[in-house]
Amino acid sequence: VLDVTAFTTSDLRRRALPLARFLVPWAVLPTELEAASAPVMPPEIAGSDWGRGRTIFFGQEARCGQCHTVKGSGGRIGPDLSNLVERDVASVVRDLREPSATIHPDHLTYVVALKDGRQLTGTVRTEGDALVIGDLEGRLTRIGRDEVEEMQALATSTMPEGLIEPLGPDGLRDLLKFLLIPSQDDAR
C-alpha cells in the first residue's frame, strides 16, 4: 500500500497529497498517451496505398465489398470488417488466404433445400418469418420459412479461396492497409 501524505511548516497535520500534484516515475504523460494511441504502421504494409486498398475492397478486383461491410459501407452477407484495425497483419492474411480456417458462427454457410426442388447455398439470416440467403456473388434471396425442406450447415466459408491471389503482393498490401489502418489520414 502506498501512503502519500504531505504537510507544511505552518500546518503539521498530515494530509493526502492530491493525485494531480503527484507524478510517479512510471506514470504515462499525456503526450506519451497521445503517441501510444496513434495508429502504428505495421512494417508489412508500410509504403502501401490506403486509397488503392479502398478501391480494391469496393471494386471488382477483389469484390470484398459485395459481401463485407467496412464502416457502414458494403454488403451484409459476410462479417463486418470494421474491427480488423484491432488485429495483426498475419491473422488477417491467413483469413484472406484460408477463409474456412475460422468462420464466425453468425456467418456459417448453409445448403438450403426448398420444397420446390431448388437448392440455395450461402449465409442465412432471419427477418421475421423469412430467411435471407446471401450467396458468394453477393446476391440476397428472400424465402419464406415454410418453403424450406431442409437446411444443412457446411464446414466451408461462403467466401471462396483464391480471391486475393490476382491482387499480387502490392495489391494485397494496399488492401491490408485499408483494412488495418482506421482512416486515410492515419495511413500517412
List where the protein language model places each region.
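Alpha-helix N-cap/N′ positions at the starts of helices
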Residues: 45-48, 76, 154, 158
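The canonical Cys-X-X-Cys-His
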Residues: 60-71, 81, 175-182
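Short coil/turn segments at secondary-structure boundaries
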Residues: 32, 67-69, 106-111
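Long amphipathic alpha-helical scaffold segments
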Residues: 2, 6-46
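Electrostatic cytochrome c docking/interface patches
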Residues: 28-59, 89, 115-117, 161-164, ...
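Gly/Gly-Pro-rich "capping" loops immediately C-terminal to redox-active cysteine motifs
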Residues: 73-98, 109-154
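C-terminal capping alpha-helices of c-type cytochrome domains
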Residues: 12, 19-26, 118-120, 124-130, ...
